[in-house]
């Protein structure tokens, strides 16, 4: 966010950590050392190969290493022994999990990357290892932002100071999977594998969608990674990760707030329902994120100011950022056509409209309608998505996924007249790459200038 400071000698090591933690989102500006290329590759592999059902604990090893080499605890430029100790701890962790990681591409990439870094820093394989980082928790009763928290760490206060009110927008992902974009476009998508939902100067979100059953093209979100970037005197960089059957109430380093800075409590995790519902509030950017586990799968919803959505360094690079651009045309499913073709046909599925070559045991159409009506009496797109999901997956939990997705819209959407959507959006050729109308092309140059003049948007 700011210009280069006096710690220029430590830049490459800081960049190593930042790139390693968020390389799949394209963070950082490139590195001068060949070893740095290992981190984006490793991070991409970690996010691209779901580990929800794997006993391999390489993600835990990565989290411990990132924690040991990030934030205020990062080794300084002249602390090569400390960095080597962290690498030895990392290597030890990989050896302990080696037996369960045979054939795991992410694991083998990590092992080779560690060897490369140890060679580059002249680290001995024998020597002390780093101690686990202990996070300093806020004092008892410190449930609010600290009184000495900088004003910059409270979005709305910062806006009011400039006589402005933030314009909030919403994005959500749920079910098989259904996407509601920042511009209230509603799409049903295939998007199997890892896809970025959000990518801007402050926040990165990526989801991994996996088949509901082997052989089925019906997918659902099995993994979610959220990265809050280091922000001035407010928060350290924090990573949150949820997977099937694991919805933690803490960041990967075990903390529940933004770190050790004065504004640390402007980023907080709150567990609403154990193992089912987590809320993350980032006051310094005016953002609220809701993550749920419904049945086996995850749902995501966010409320964020448009100014944060538009805070990007390179607008043209925001290609497959789903919350902004929507799903690519070749990944979209016309579930309304499927709904129309299925109505009155019972459990019979039309191959031309079905997204799955082979389907699990599903509900009859009338039963699916009745179950969705119980939770979603208004026949909007959430209701139609519910029916679609029951017909394609046979999993009644998808009824609750649609219900909670709508409940999150009611809580997070700033325009109460747009809670219910009735017409699904399928992009026409040429429109799929259109972004938010928040930054029209004639005004894009002015927006970039404003971003340069005012580095703090909330």
From Swiss-Prot:
The topology of this chain with respect to the membrane is: Lipid-anchor; GPI-anchor
Looking up Gene3D superfamilies in the UniProt record yields: Mog1/PsbP, alpha/beta/alpha sandwich
Q: Which Pfam families match?
A: RGM_C (PF06534), RGM_N (PF06535)
The residues of the propeptide are 54-176, 434-458
Could you say which residues form the signal peptide? 1-53
What positions does the record give for glycosylation? 122, 167, 397
Query: What's the stated role of this polypeptide?
Result: Member of the repulsive guidance molecule (RGM) family that performs several functions in the developing and adult nervous system. Regulates cephalic neural tube closure, inhibits neurite outgrowth and cortical neuron branching, and the formation of mature synapses. Binding to its receptor NEO1/neogenin induces activation of RHOA-ROCK1/Rho-kinase signaling pathway through UNC5B-ARHGEF12/LARG-PTK2/FAK1 cascade, leading to collapse of the neuronal growth cone and neurite outgrowth inhibition.
Q: What residue spans carry the region label Disordered? A: 121-149
What Gene Ontology cellular-component terms does the record carry? plasma membrane; side of membrane
Q: Which GO terms fall under biological process for this protein?
A: BMP signaling pathway
Record-given protein name: Repulsive guidance molecule A
Q: Name one GO molecular function term.
A: coreceptor activity
Gene, per the UniProt record: RGMA
Disulfide pairs?
A: 153-234, 171-323
Which cellular compartments is it found in?
Answer: Cell membrane
């Amino acid at each position: 966010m700011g210009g280069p400071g006096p710690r220029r000698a430590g830049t490459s090591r800081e960049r190593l950590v930042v790139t390693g933690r968020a390389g799949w989102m394209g963070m950082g500006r490139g590195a001068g050392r060949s070893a740095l290329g290992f981190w984006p590759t490793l991070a991409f592999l970690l996010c691209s190969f779901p580990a929800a059902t794997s006993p391999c604990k390489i993600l835990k090893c990565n989290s411990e290493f990132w924690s040991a080499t990030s934030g205020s605890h990062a080794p300084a430029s002249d602390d090569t022994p400390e960095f080597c100790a962290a690498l030895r701890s990392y290597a030890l962790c990989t050896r302990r999990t080696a037996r369960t990681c045979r054939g795991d591409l992410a694991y083998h990439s990590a092992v080779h990357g560690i060897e490369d870094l140890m060679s580059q820093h002249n680290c001995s394989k024998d020597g002390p290892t780093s101690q686990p980082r202990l996070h300093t928790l806020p004092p008892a009763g410190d449930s609010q932002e600290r009184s000495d928290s900088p004003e910059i760490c409270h979005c709305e206060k910062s806006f009011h100071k400039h006589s402005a009110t933030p314009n909030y927008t919403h994005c959500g992902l749920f079910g098989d999977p259904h996407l509601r974009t920042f511009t209230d476009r509603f799409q049903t998508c295939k998007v199997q594998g890892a896809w970025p939902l959000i990518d801007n100067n402050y926040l990165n979100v990526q989801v991994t969608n996996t088949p509901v059953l082997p052989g089925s093209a019906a997918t659902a979100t099995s993994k979610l990674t959220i990265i809050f970037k280091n922000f001035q005197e407010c928060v350290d960089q924090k990573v949150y990760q949820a997977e099937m059957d694991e919805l933690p109430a803490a960041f990967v380093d075990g903390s529940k707030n933004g770190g050790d800075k004065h504004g640390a409590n402007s980023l907080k995790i709150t567990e609403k329902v154990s193992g089912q519902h987590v809320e993350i509030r980032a006051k310094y950017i005016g953002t609220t994120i809701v993550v749920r586990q419904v049945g086996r799968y995850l749902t995501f919803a966010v409320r964020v100011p448009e100014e944060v959505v538009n805070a990007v360094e390179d607008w043209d690079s925001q290609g497959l950022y789903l919350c902004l651009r929507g799903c690519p045309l070749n990944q979209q499913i016309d579930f309304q056509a499927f709904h129309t073709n299925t109505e009155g046909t019972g459990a019979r599925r039309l191959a031309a409209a079905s997204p799955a070559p082979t389907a699990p045991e599903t509900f009859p159409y009338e039963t699916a309608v009745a179950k969705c009506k119980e939770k979603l009496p208004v026949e909007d797109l959430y209701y139609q998505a519910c029916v679609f999901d029951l017909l394609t997956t046979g999993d009644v939990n998808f009824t609750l996924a649609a219900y909670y997705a709508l409940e999150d819209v009611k809580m997070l959407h700033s325009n109460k007249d747009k809670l219910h959507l009735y017409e699904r959006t399928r992009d026409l050729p040429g429109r799929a790459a259109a972004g938010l109308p928040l930054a029209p092309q004639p005004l894009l140059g002015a927006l970039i200038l404003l971003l340069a003049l005012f580095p703090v948007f909330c």
